[in-house]
Amino acid sequence: MISYIQQNFKEKISLKEFGEQFHLSEKYISRYFKEHFHITLSQYITHLRLEHAKQLLQDTDTPVTEIAMQSGYQNVSYFIRIFKKHMEFLR
């Protein structure tokens, strides 16, 4: 499951679609993530996306709008807001 998420985090992954992919119930997936990672599936995906974006911002001259898209965000304003919150949390 984790490798699938790590390979596809840039795409939209809903709990329902994820469950269908692995033939698991949404409830089981939610419980699994809470028990093993202490976060939800969507929080895990957000973390992967933001860490990917952070790496691109540090290592490339790619514009923020492009980095947002490459990290799975269609709305640049939302990406910037979430990214700032994530960076403040890490301080």
Regions found by a protein language model. Give the residues of each.
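Core residues of bacterial helix-turn-helix
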Residues: 21-22, 71
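Terminal helix-turn-helix DNA-binding modules in bacterial transcription factors
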Residues: 3, 7, 12-16, 35-77
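Short hydrophobic/aromatic patch on the recognition helix
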Residues: 29, 33, 78-79, 83
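…primarily DNA-binding HTH/wHTH and HhH modules…
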Residues: 81-91
